[in-house]
């Protein structure tokens, strides 16, 4: 076993040395793997080299030349051919590789000897090495590029051949070693495996380098032109290549050179690409920056629209296009055949010359003085101003679409024509045309759709609708009426047959009756009482007309025909709807006259309504005198005035009354003019006559009527003035006097007593103080005793209650402490400090956006909005909506003003 291990180690070390030698040879480029076959070829050549150029120029038809050329061609080798045979494999360090290779070489050598050796190569094709070296020097000087192109090819071919031979020798040596061992891979250490791997990787690297394309660093010699590039020797610079500076030296423009300098930079390799997640993040950031810059352009417009009080859409003004109409010409030259024909007609008629009008204007103003010219200019300016105003007014009125407005304007125009009463041929012609249209269309009849609907739905009962329909029928009659021509005979006579005003009214009434009969049988005017009233009015009008005609004829007027009739058996007295029947005689008439006079005297009212006279009348002794009149009625008279006082005493009492009670000092004049009710009372018994009873009834009726006419203020005043003595304050002198003095001193009261009587029992100040105290106690903090009775004590029979020392008192917080109230030092004020939580949502915690401070906001709230406090323009501005749009208008998106 020891011998076997030593042998394997020696073989492995030998294989390592072979592998190292092969690697060094490949790295150094030394391919000395020439075989015996090569030696034999070298021996036959005798130090000569085949002239390949000559062979390429020679005859290619001979078979020998073909064989020689084929021997120098680069062919693709199969794996079997590279290993030496199809059946046997050349394995690294195999013991069979060398024997196989020796057998193949011997066989090839025998075949070549049988064929007669190198018969395909002529002696003329051979050339000495010295000649080859001389040719290389010459070609390098004349045309270095061609030699450099050809020599690498030859070198590459030689290297390929040498590599093949070296690989074959290695395989043979390896095969010999493998033959000595039965299993070469059984006892291979790890170090040996690492060495083998290194050799294999080095081989692979060399193969990739050999297969890489060769780069030519040389160019053709000679001067550079449009067909030939400059040579490497002629190029400037250390690297021998054309640089950017060489190209920029030709340019004279400095600005271009400065811009080109930006292209200069050190070429560097690309960095390792970032992960996709980070790349997407960078892309999003870049996109956000671009979009932010684009959106920031609209910031000013958005802020302006937000701060604007009113926005009228569309914000973009519509583009106005000047469309050429059929009557306006855009150019002086005619564009169509029609324009050419029109120009031709104008030129033939001498109307197309604009200079002609200007000449006439110059001639008209040539003879004018400067003052006349200025006057004419002023008149023309005024005319143009008036025309402009009329045009503007006409455009404004034309836009009005109200039917009511059109109807009113039409009536006004017709009324003005009637008032003008100027008849001309044009008016007659217009009237004839309107009359013909009316007779043909019958527009102002009840045949129209509107009139039929009004009659069908019973709208004729409405006063306005009925009036409109009547006006329509009258308009139709006016349009159909003929124009009355005046004859010459009538003008000579001077007698114009006209009706009087009363007859015209009568005729109009008849026409209106006929019209109403056409309209229908319903309505207020067709009721019985309305018809009776119209009939009475008609009879009165007829009577008036008859009297006027009698006056015209010279007859007398009998105004009072009822005076001739005698009153036989009945005397009618108007007394609120009652009739009293008495025998018709002259005595009864006299009695009635006396009764009326007596009643008027009874109804006279005393003018003195002052409080002083009333008090004097109540306190002084009043005598009642009863008397009986001739008719048997007992009349009780109550004298309102007492005993007459002296003038001085009356004046003194008046002055004292004014000083004592100033409320009664300034009485209005109306109180003095009001009449006092009658103080006489008619006592009626069974024996009273009918006239007395009738007079009493008439007097009562008149009194009731007067009471109804009086207002509430007068009634209240009467009640105040007729107060009883029990409700009046009487002040008596405590030191006493006579009864007369005491009666006089009743009126001597003071103003304080009147106030005390007016506000008796009204202690307002005390009530206010009590209410304020109650409010303070309710809103103040309170202490509530929450101690429960019996809690913590003994109960039951024999238990004695103890005085409990500990009390549980809870303090309830009120609205505000009484010491911190705002009305603490204000005696006559109560300030409510309760907070209503329902009102908190209507209170603003901060000032709204447009306002800067609280004063501005409160000032805006104080400003009224209604039409009653502001002008029409201000009201419209205040209620104007913030966003206004026109119906049917296309709202396009905003156009960027910065483009």
UniProtKB/Swiss-Prot annotation:
Molecular function GO labels: ATP binding
Lineage: superkingdom: Eukaryota
Positions of ATP binding: 260-267
Main location (coarse class): nucleus
GO cellular component terms attached to this protein's record: nucleolus; nucleoplasm; small-subunit processome
Keywords: ATP-binding, Nucleotide-binding, Nucleus, Phosphoprotein, Ribonucleoprotein, Ribosome biogenesis, rRNA processing
Biased amino acid composition, Basic residues: 1-14
UniProt cross-references to InterPro entries, sorted A to Z: SSU_processome_Utp14
Quaternary structure, from the entry: Interacts with snoRNA U3. Interacts with MPP10. Component of the ribosomal small subunit (SSU) processome composed of at least 40 protein subunits and snoRNA U3.
UniProt function note: Involved in nucleolar processing of pre-18S ribosomal RNA.
Name of the featured protein: U3 small nucleolar RNA-associated protein 14
Source organism of this protein record: Saccharomyces cerevisiae (strain ATCC 204508 / S288c)
């Amino acid at each position: 076993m020891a011998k076997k291990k030593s042998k394997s180690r020696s073989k492995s070390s030998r294989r390592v040395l072979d592998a190292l030698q092969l690697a060094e040879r490949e790295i150094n480029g030394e391919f000395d793997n020439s075989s015996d076959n090569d030696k034999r070829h070298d021996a036959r050549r005798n130090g000569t080299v085949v002239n390949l150029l000559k062979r390429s120029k020679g005859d290619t038809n001979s078979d020998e030349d073909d064989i020689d050329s084929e021997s120098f061609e680069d062919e693709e080798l199969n794996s079997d051919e590279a290993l030496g045979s199809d059946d046997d494999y050349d394995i690294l360090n195999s013991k069979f590789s060398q024997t196989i290779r020796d057998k193949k070489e011997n066989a090839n050598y025998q075949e070549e000897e049988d064929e007669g050796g190198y018969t395909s190569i002529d002696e003329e094709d051979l050339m000495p090495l010295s000649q080859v070296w001389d040719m290389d020097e010459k070609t390098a000087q004349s045309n270095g590029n061609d030699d450099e192109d050809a020599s690498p090819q030859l070198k590459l071919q030689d290297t390929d051949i040498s590599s093949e031979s070296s690989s074959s020798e290695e395989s043979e040596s390896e095969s010999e070693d493998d033959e000595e061992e039965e299993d070469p891979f059984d006892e291979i250490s790890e170090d040996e495996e690492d060495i083998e791997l290194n050799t294999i990787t080095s081989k692979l690297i060399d193969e990739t380098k050999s297969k890489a394309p060769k780069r030519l660093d040389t160019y053709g010699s000679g001067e550079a032109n449009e067909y030939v590039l400059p040579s490497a020797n002629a190029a400037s610079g250390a690297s021998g290549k054309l640089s950017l500076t060489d190209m920029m030296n030709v340019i004279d423009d400095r600005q271009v050179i400065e811009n080109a300098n930006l292209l200069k930079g050190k070429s560097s390799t690309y960095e390792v690409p970032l992960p996709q997640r980070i790349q997407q993040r960078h892309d999003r950031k870049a996109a956000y920056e671009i979009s932010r810059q684009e959106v920031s352009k609209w910031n000013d417009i958005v802020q302006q629209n937000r701060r604007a009080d009113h926005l009228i859409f569309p914000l973009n003004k519509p583009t106005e296009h000047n469309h050429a109409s059929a009557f306006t010409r855009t150019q002086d030259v005619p564009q169509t055949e029609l324009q050419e024909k029109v120009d031709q007609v104008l030129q033939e008629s001498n109307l197309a010359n604009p200079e002609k009008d200007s000449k006439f204007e110059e001639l008209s103003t040539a003879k004018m003085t400067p003052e006349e010219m200025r006057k004419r200019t002023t008149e023309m300016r005024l005319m143009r101003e008036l025309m402009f105003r009329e045009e503007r007014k006409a455009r404004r009125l034309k836009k009005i679409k109200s039917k009511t407005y059109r109807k009113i304007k039409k009536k006004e125009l017709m009324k003005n024509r009637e008032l003008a009463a100027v008849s001309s041929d044009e008016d007659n012609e217009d009237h004839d045309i309107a009359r013909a249209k009316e007779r043909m269309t019958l527009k102002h009849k009840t045949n129209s759709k509107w009139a039929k609907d009004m009659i069908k739905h019973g709208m004729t009962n409405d006063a306005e609708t009925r009036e409109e329909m009547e006006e329509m029928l009258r308009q139709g009659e006016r349009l159909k009426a003929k124009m009355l021509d005046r004859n010459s005979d009538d003008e000579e006579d001077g007698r114009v047959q006209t009706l009087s005003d009363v007859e015209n009214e009568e005729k109009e009434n008849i026409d209106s009756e006929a019209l109403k009969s056409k309209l229908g049988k319903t309505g207020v005017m067709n009721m019985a009482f309305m018809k009776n009233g119209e009939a009475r009015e008609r009879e009165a009008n007829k009577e008036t007309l008859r009297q006027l005609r009698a006056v015209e004829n010279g007859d007398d007027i009998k105004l009072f025909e009822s005076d001739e009739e005698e009153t036989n058996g009945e005397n009618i007295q108007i007394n609120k709807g009652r009739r009293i029947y008495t025998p018709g005689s002259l005595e009864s008439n006299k009695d009635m006259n006396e009764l009326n006079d007596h009643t008027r005297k009874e109804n006279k009212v005393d003018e003195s309504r002052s409080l002083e006279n009333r008090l004097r009348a109540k306190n002084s002794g009043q005598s009642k005198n009863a008397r009986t009149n001739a008719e048997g009625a007992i009349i009780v008279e109550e004298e309102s005035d007492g005993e007459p006082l002296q003038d001085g005493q009356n004046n003194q009492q008046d002055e004292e009354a004014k000083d004592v009670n100033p409320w009664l000092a300034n009485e209005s004049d109306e109180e003095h003019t009001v009449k006092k009710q009658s103080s006489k009372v008619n006592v009626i018994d069974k024996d009273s006559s009918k006239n007395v009873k009738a007079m009493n009834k008439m007097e009562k009726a008149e009194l009731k009527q007067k009471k109804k006419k009086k207002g509430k203020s007068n009634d209240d005043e009467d009640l105040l003035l007729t107060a009883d003595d029990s409700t009046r304050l009487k002040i008596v002198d405590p030191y006493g006097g006579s009864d007369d003095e005491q009666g006089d001193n009743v009126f001597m009261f003071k103003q304080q007593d009147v106030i005390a009587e007016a506000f008796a029992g009204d202690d307002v100040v005390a009530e206010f103080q009590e209410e304020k105290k109650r409010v303070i106690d309710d809103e103040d903090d309170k202490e509530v005793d929450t101690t429960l009775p019996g809690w913590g004590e003994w109960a039951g029979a024999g238990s004695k209650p103890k005085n409990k020392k500990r009390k549980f008192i809870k303090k309830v917080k009120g609205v505000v402490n009484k010491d911190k109230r705002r009305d603490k030092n204000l005696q006559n004020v109560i300030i409510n400090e309760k907070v209503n939580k329902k009102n908190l949502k209507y209170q603003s915690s901060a000032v709204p956006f447009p306002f800067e401070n609280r004063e501005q906001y409160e000032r805006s709230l104080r400003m009224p909005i209604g039409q009653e406090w502001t002008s029409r323009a201000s009201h419209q501005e205040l209620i104007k909506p913030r966003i206004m749009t026109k119906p049917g208008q296309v709202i396009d998106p905003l156009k960027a003003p910065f483009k």
